[in-house]
Amino acid sequence: MKFLLDHDVPEDLSYLLEQLGHDVILLRKALAEDASDEEVLQFAHERGCVLLTCNRDDFLHLATKQLHHGIVIVIRRRTRAAERAALFRLLEGAGETGLQNNINFA
């Protein structure tokens, strides 16, 4: 599966995804920092990526208006280890079909 990590997602989550065999694009290496949320979601959609973001409010709203391949809202936790564990549990439980074209929380 392919993932696009938004600017606000801790980069160490990319290492977990890569270790699990997923392709990862870091938004900060692909688009300007001032890219709009609409541009980010379109970029992910055009590349067949599930978007990982901490920006819940804006992307929940956009998901009702724009096509997407899936959005994972990363909930900030006390530690990075807890964030990695939550994402791992989501990936294990949802699988590819549960993530694609859906909105999930990790």
Can you annotate each of these PLM segments?
Residues 2, 6-7, 11, 15-20, ...:
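Acidic, PIN/NYN-like endoribonuclease modules and their adjacent C-terminal/linker elements
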Residues 1-3, 45-50:
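Short active-site oxyanion
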Residues 37, 48-61:
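Acidic, metal-binding active-site segment of PIN/NYN-like and related structure-specific nucleases
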Residues 25, 50-53, 73:
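Short, conserved beta-strand segments within well-ordered enzyme catalytic domains
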Residues 23-31:
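A short beta-strand-loop structural module common to alpha/beta enzyme folds
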